[in-house]
């Protein structure tokens, strides 16, 4: 990943933005200085002898999009915000890189994921000898508490803010002028 390769990758990323590309397939057809991106990638492959390509393509549309690249270009995060807030966007993107939330909030987690987690919790509780003989209502209440703990750990807004563990990300966003995260994307190599 020398400077030449990084510049090559950046030129492709710039072309994706400039051409409002929405998919990897569409990106392969974009022209840069008269050459298709797919042909440029094949030429680069021939010169470096390693298979390269655009394996994943993410795009966010928001009033403001912040980005963060972590770990020698091995992970990237995009965060859509309701307004321009560069420092807040970078802080939130770093949070996402570090804590890998599943969604912005509990309402954004797919129903099948919630049901799968609920089933795991209930199955685990059924196998727990301490739960034997407990009323179903009590088991259901405990399961909901465990599900809420799952949301706290796995949703961005409910997570403890990594730069100040005394507040949640949601509280940080409010204190920064009611900044709202509209969506995020986290992509890691490997």
Q: Model-found features: residue ranges?
A:
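N-terminal assembly/interaction segments in proteins that build large macromolecular machines
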Residues: 1-190
């Amino acid at each position: 990943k020398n400077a030449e390769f990084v510049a090559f990758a950046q030129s492709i990323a710039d072309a994706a933005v400039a051409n409002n590309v929405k998919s990897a397939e569409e990106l392969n057809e974009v022209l840069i200085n008269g050459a298709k991106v797919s042909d440029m990638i094949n030429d680069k492959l021939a010169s470096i002898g390693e298979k390269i390509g655009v394996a994943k393509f993410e795009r966010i549309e928001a009033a403001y999009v912040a980005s963060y690249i972590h770990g020698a270009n091995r992970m990237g995060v995009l965060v859509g915000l309701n307004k321009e807030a560069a420092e807040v966007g970078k802080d939130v993107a770093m949070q996402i890189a570090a804590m890998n939330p599943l969604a912005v909030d509990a309402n954004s987690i797919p129903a099948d994921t919630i049901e799968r987690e609920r089933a795991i919790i209930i199955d685990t509780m059924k196998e727990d000898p301490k739960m034997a003989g407990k009323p179903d209502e009590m088991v259901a209440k405990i399961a909901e508490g465990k599900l809420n703990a799952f949301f706290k750990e796995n949703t961005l807004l409910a997570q403890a803010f990594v730069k100040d563990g005394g507040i949640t990300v949601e509280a940080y966003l409010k204190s920064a002028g009611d900044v709202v995260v509209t969506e995020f994307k986290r992509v890691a190599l490997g």
